[in-house]
A protein has these predicted regions:
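Contiguous segments within soluble domain cores/interaction surfaces
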Residues: 3-141
Length: 141
């Protein structure tokens, strides 16, 4: 299976078909008037492709601060479901709330890694920008 999308949102809801509704999609700029700060984001990972039904893969999520320190780390085995039909590839939608807290302003890096047994790992990175609204200057335009 391959990572198709890695998204951030304020919230996500899935229906019985697996379709997802996202609220506040692409919340990558955070204005925090105080330090330390804390809030939650919903991480959505969409995987697609062929895989051996009944097997497992390793999902890892790491959030690093602007200084390179680990602010959050998570790893879990994920079961791979069988495809809905022999003519349809497998799809997996994973939505999880992740805590987001820090002690500094700057660019935080969120890395998602997916690894199936016998396969090379693959990853996606998302930058999240934490700004002090008092220090922000409007862009020239």
């Amino acid at each position: 299976m391959e990572i198709e999308n890695v998204l951030l949102a304020e919230a996500a809801v899935a229906d019985i078909r697996g379709a997802m509704t996202l609220v506040g999609y692409n919340q990558r700029v955070v204005n925090s008037p105080n330090l330390p700060f804390s809030f939650k984001q919903t991480l959505i990972i969409t995987l697609r492709g062929e895989a051996e039904a009944g097997s497992h893969a390793q999902l890892s999520v790491n959030l690093n601060s602007p200084e390179g320190d680990s602010a959050f780390a998570f790893a879990q085995q994920v079961p791979i479901p069988p495809p809905a039909s022999k003519d349809v590839p497998s799809f997996i939608n994973i939505a999880m709330d992740i805590p987001f807290s820090g002690n500094s302003y700057g660019t935080y890096s969120l890395k998602v890694t997916w690894r199936e047994m016998g396969q090379e790992s693959q990853g996606r990175d998302i930058d999240i920008f934490v700004l002090d609204p008092a220090a922000a200057t409007p862009a020239a335009g």
